[in-house]
Structures are given as C-alpha cells and as structure tokens.
Amino acid sequence: MSEFKDAIIKYARYVIQQSRSNLTKAKKGGGNLYKSLDYKVKQNRGNSGRFESGYNVEFFMEDYGAYQDLGVKGIGGQRKTGANKGKAYENKGQGGQFQFRKGVPNRSMIKSLNTWIKRKGIKGRNQKTGRFITDQSLSFAIAKSVFHTGIKRSLFFSKPFEAGITKYDNDIANAYGNDIIIELTR
C-alpha cells in the first residue's frame, strides 16, 4: 500500500473519531447518526475507467447529519397560543446553510420525530388538563417548534474535517512526494 493512501486513511480515521467524540460531548452519541459515520478511500479512475495515481476519501453519514452539522434557519414568526402568545420565536439556526420554507412541517419530519419519541419513551401532556397526548400530537408540536426556531448548527463534522486538513496536510504532501519518488526510481 502506498504512503499516500496510508496518510489519507489516517486523516479519515481522525475525522470520524473526532466527529463521534463531538456527538458524544453533545449527548448525541450512540444513535443512528453516530453509528452511520464512515469513510471510504478510493483510487482515482480516468475517463476510460483505468486506475490512475491518487486517492479520494468519501465520508458517509445519515442524511440529516448535514442539517445537524450546518444548522437550519427557522421561519420565525410569532406564537399564536399558550403562555408566550404574541412573542417571537427565537431563531436558533442563525448562520445555517439550510432553511425551512414557508408552510407547515412536512410529513417525513413528523414521522421521524414520532419514531424518535417512541424510541426515547417520551410522553407529552396537555398543559391545561394534564392528560397525556398522543405521540402523533407531540411529534407535530415538536416539529412545529423546530420549524419555527430552526436547528442550531453543531459543526460536529465540519470542525474535525477542517482541523484534520490542518493537522495532516504535511503528512499527506510528504507521503505523496515519497510515492512519486518511488515511482520514478522504479
């Protein structure tokens, strides 16, 4: 195996390890996102499909990982009911790359939240009567809140990705240079 590939693998392992560490610190470790973090190192191919020199690293995670990492801007607005009626929603997703569109939360978001609520064993209650509410109602209430307030960016993946480039740039460059020297001396 080439020194360059070894250096790329070292970088990729660092990014995954640090990303998982960040998720654990944010009390989101052990879940689907944590388990889905992975990488794959591939050798470059030319137009004809033949292998060429150099390698690429691809990182994989659950689709919603990008939203957790980079944040989502909420639509804002004012609260219509409850004790905080008339107060504006605080937008947690400031600086987020993504944003919710006007309207209501989509069904896939509500369905995902419903699954999460059941997995966590969360039981919602009606504020006035104290009665339990259905999981569907609770998931809609949470989805509506997230839709208005957004998702705060965590940069759990972006920070290690950038830090890894800074940390391993010399190792990767030296390994690539050594591989070139080895090829020229053959």
Roles of regions detected by a PLM:
Residues 1-49:
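Charge-rich, low-complexity N-terminal segments
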Residues 32-186:
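Charged, low-complexity interaction tracts
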